[in-house]
Amino acid sequence: MNKIEALIEQYCPEGIEFKDLREVAKISNGKDHKYLEAGNYPVYGSGGIMRYVNQFIYNVESVLIPRKGSIGNIFYVSEPFWTVDTIFYTKIDRRSITPKFLYYYLKTLDLTELNFAGGVPSLTKTILDRISIPIPPLPVQEEIVNILDKFTTLEAELEAELEARKTQYEFYRNQLLNFEGKDVEWKTLGEIGVFIRGNGLQKKDFTSSGVGCIHYGQVYTLYGIYAYSTKTFVSNDFAKKLKKAKKGDLIIAATSENVEDVCKAVAWLGDNQIAISGDAFIFRHNQNPKFIAYYFKTNSFFENKKRFATGTK
């Protein structure tokens, strides 16, 4: 029996009580902030902190729940704050529930399922008031919060470490693949290979099985430097109409909404040929496919690419 189970057995052997949110917290509206002067108190909207002002709307621990817009963005605040009219704040009955326990529980819910609007996602007090909240005894709540806080800290540390490693990787990749001023032979892509434009494939053509395929949009959303298998397929009959990439080819996105993703490339290392969509190129060459794909990610290639990019999607 773990500590949480032991506490539940000790304090609520008959089970955990549930209450509507309105029974443990009063939901309050935010207000306009435009007339306020600059200061030290954060102003929250549904997207997060917007600015800092010289007044606060509430100065007690609270959970902020968006009313409109990014309704999944729930915030826990422990310092004085101001909220605008797109986000609710809560006055919590601490005799029944700890604010952070309420925050963690609400984060487990998909509030978008409670959206009542057809346009901009929206929530109302009436809808939120009816949310059922588990109310274990306060010692149980505090232990749960303590455990989740530790995992939150660990997650933040791991994210920071991952970001540091990513920066380190990008630095060494650019250094290792920087041949400017060095005694190496330079050739254009056209001198080492040929470009074959894809054709005809749209997302609506995907099937659950068949011939593997890569749509140009997937090159910068689903794939890394190289791939041995595809995420999607087309029927055998439809595949006969499409251009195919074979092992060692690069698949290059020819268009994007930003210059960073234009010419994003994935090296195809699978044994079977795969179908390619329009707005993508197959680059067929006699070089190391991973080397070429890695080079496509360097700062040097990016700067050259910017010179030739004629527009975005």
Language model: regions and residue ranges:
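Amphipathic alpha-helical segments
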Residues: 1, 15-17, 129-166, 170, ...
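Accessory (non-catalytic) regions of SAM-dependent nucleic-acid methyltransferases
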Residues: 1-11, 68
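Intrinsic, low-complexity N-terminal interaction/targeting segments
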Residues: 5, 33-35, 71-78, 87, ...
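Non-catalytic DNA-recognition/assembly elements of restriction-modification systems
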Residues: 10-43, 179-199
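Short, structured motif recognition centered on aromatic/hydrophobic residues
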Residues: 16, 41, 103, 148-151, ...
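DNA target-recognition patches
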Residues: 22-71, 202-235, 246
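A short beta-sheet element
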Residues: 45-107, 116-119, 124, 215, ...
